[in-house]
Design a protein with these regions (language model features):
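Feature for long, exposed domains in two main contexts
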Residues: 338-568
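Bacterial N-terminal signal peptides that target proteins for export
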Residues: 2-16
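Alpha-helical segments with a strong preference for the paired helices of cellulosomal dockerin domains
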Residues: 82-87, 574-595, 603-619
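Divalent cation-coordinating acidic motifs and surrounding scaffolds
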Residues: 30-340
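Surface-exposed loop/turn positions
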Residues: 69, 197, 330, 357-358, ...
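Bacterial N-terminal signal peptides
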Residues: 13-25
Length: 619
């Protein structure tokens, strides 16, 4: 059970902290606000009652306003039910609708103080009608039990049992015993629901002090054990005036009892399952008696000024006046946080990746999709774990949408083939929607491309022949380039550049793309216009790369283009006059050390070797 000090000290003092932390009364429609209110047979001022109900929605004294999720009303007669429903509907914020849960009464109950009625927000809850029960509590009265199920949640722990009761009034041992009997009947029913059930005991319990046996029976051990958000200490006297709920009036008139604010008759008592800050749970510091500023002990709530909203006296006084006119009780309110909603989306890795590529990842974006303010939504812990082609395990706390945390899972690229894996995003949070989300991943790991100068073997160097006529037209030589070994598990290949530097050679077409099973090619041109008969070699460097995917590699092959030139002059007949003689010798010597026509062996330099070749061809 919680320490009483935590809540007594945490009430009005905590308001300022909540106002700051919750961003100054921002709307928070997803939180579950619960109101317990004795409407005194609907004999009070109807307009004032409607305005009090509206104030229950608008109340931001603990940091945020939220349309009420559950109203539990006491002293409802069959004849007044339609008027109460009209008041609930008239006070509802735009866009929100309320449904009447199962309503039961009897002639004896209806002729006495009336029954209990629950109205719930249809966007938050549905009622499981079979979960309703009437529980006899004495004095011709029944307590009611309703089972409400949260919309958008599948977990059984997102269900809320609400007990509504109006126990026997007045002092005296006989009346106390009857109240005790009523509490014991509710506890017996709640205990039978099993462990861990989320339950609220609400209503006008008519307890006169904190030592009354009926009050204490709520805290007995068992599945339905309750705790008091205000602590179990005394609520008597001026120092506890802020806890009181009856009577907001100092006069008895028109069916409404006076006496001033000096009793705590109205309660919302949660069970332990709502005390763990996990899933559906009470938000600390939000339990309050609406309009009770703690300064009206034993007098009317609207006597003088009311300071329930310290910075807005007019608002406080208007609320106090309406409370005075509406009934002879004031509403008790508590706010509950809602369970988390796990949301995980995948940013998939590339569909194809080169083997042994580094830095390849899948990303998982994790968020808590439950709408509302952080204070009203269960903070969601998560784990994201990779399996198969993915690896790594990462933990964190998810922000509310639209924000998200990004978890990066490495992709293993060591093994070629179609690889699969799973990113599993889980949360241990109680009653969380989608507690486990499995995100499948598929990625194909491919070998690097493999340039080859042959389509039948892996060849990195080869001679490609060609023929030309001295002084004739240019000759184009096509060099085929294959992606050797290509299949679905190998990268396609691009030819990115072709380089040739030998005299009389040039590149005509030096690039190609997406070479797979069909070879590509480059084209090199030889111009024989100024050459003589002979053999001319040119190294051609062909550079390649993989397709543009992670891990892309580069490679190269070298083809030697060998052109055989026929016709025209002999190689040593430099002036082409039909005779190798002194004139040719003079031309060769004039070109000494250069790369010119006197380079008879095509080694790039006119030197002694070329001189020897010329002399051997003399005449």
């Amino acid at each position: 059970m919680r320490s009483p000090t935590r809540f007594v000290l945490g009430h009005r003092a905590a308001v300022a902290a909540f106002l700051l932390a919750a961003a100054c009364a921002a709307p928070a429609a997803a939180q579950v606000r619960v109101v317990s209110y004795n409407v005194t047979n609907m004999v009070g001022n109807a307009t004032a009652l409607r305005d009090v109900l509206k104030a229950c929605h608008d109340d931001d004294s603990d940091g945020f306003a939220v349309p009420v999720g559950v109203f539990m009303f006491c002293e409802v007669h069959q004849s007044g039910l339609s008027a109460l429903q009209a008041a609930v509907n008239a006070a509802a914020p735009a866009g929100y609708t309320y449904a009447l849960a199962t309503f039961t009464t009897s002639s004896s109950e209806d002729s006495a103080s009336g029954a209990q009625a629950v109205f719930y927000r249809t966007d938050l809850f549905t009622e499981f009608a079979a979960g309703h029960a009437d529980i006899f509590t004495g004095a011709s009265r029944n307590a009611d039990r309703w089972q409400l199920r949260m919309v958008g949640y599948d977990s059984t722990l997102a269900r809320l049992y609400v007990y509504g009761a109006h126990l026997k009034a007045s002092t005296g041992s006989a009346n106390e015993a009857e109240r005790l009997s009523g509490v014991q009947a509710m506890r017996s029913n709640a205990d039978a629901l099993g462990a861990g059930v989320h339950t609220l005991y609400t209503g006008d319990m008519n307890f006169y002090n904190n030592t009354e046996t009926g009050y204490l029976a709520f805290f007995n051990a068992g599945n339905g054990q309750a705790w008091d958000p205000l602590g179990t200490g005394s609520w008597s006297g001026t120092g506890n005036a802020w806890k009181h709920t009856q009577s907001p009036r100092d006069i008895t008139a028109d069916g409404l009892v006076g006496g001033g604010m000096d009793d705590r008759f109205d309660f919302i008592l949660p069970t332990a399952a709502l005390d763990d800050a996990d899933g559906l749970s009470v938000i600390d510091g939000t339990y309050r008696a609406l309009g009770n500023d703690g300064n009206h002990y034993n007098t009317a709530i609207n006597a003088g000024n009311n300071t329930f909203y310290p910075s807005n006296l007019a608002r406080s006084n208007t609320l106090a006046d309406n409370l005075f006119l509406a009934t002879d009780h004031i509403p008790v309110i508590v706010d509950l946080q809602v369970p988390a909603k796990n949301q995980a989306t995948l940013v998939a890795p590339p569909a194809r990746v080169i083997q042994n590529a580094v830095g390849v990842n899948a990303q998982v974006r994790v968020s808590n999709a439950a709408p509302g303010l952080p204070i009203g939504v269960d903070a969601m812990s998560y784990t994201v774990a990779g399996s198969g082609v993915l690896s790594g395990t990462f933990n964190g706390t998810a922000p509310l949408t639209p924000s998200f945390n990004t978890v990066t899972l490495p992709v293993s690229t060591a093994t070629v083939g179609l690889r699969t894996g799973t990113a599993l995003a889980t949360t241990p949070n109680q009653a969380a929607q989608s507690p486990s989300i499995s995100l499948p991943v598929t990625v194909r790991i491919v070998r690097p491309s493999n340039p080859s100068l042959s389509s039948v073997a892996d060849v990195n160097a080869a001679v490609v022949p060609g023929a030309a006529t001295a002084g004739g037209a240019p000759v184009d030589v096509t060099i085929p380039v294959s992606n050797w070994g290509f299949n679905v598990d190998q990268s396609a290949m691009d030819i990115t550049a072709t380089q040739v530097s030998a005299a009389n050679f040039s590149v005509v077409s030096g690039t190609a793309t997406n070479i797979g099973g069909t070879p590509g090619s480059v084209v090199v041109r030889f111009n024989p216009a100024s050459v003589v008969a002979g053999t001319y070699d040119a190294p051609v460097t062909i550079q390649t790369r993989d397709e543009n995917i992670p891990g892309m590699t580069t490679a190269s092959v070298v083809a030697t283009v060998r052109i055989t030139v026929t016709g025209g002059c002999a190689a040593a007949d430099l002036n082409c006059d039909g005779v190798v003689d002194g004139t040719d010798l003079g031309l060769l010597l004039s070109q000494w050390g250069s790369n010119a026509s006197g380079d008879l062996n095509n080694d790039g330099t006119v030197d002694g070797t070329d001189l020897g070749l010329l002399l051997s061809a003399w005449g």
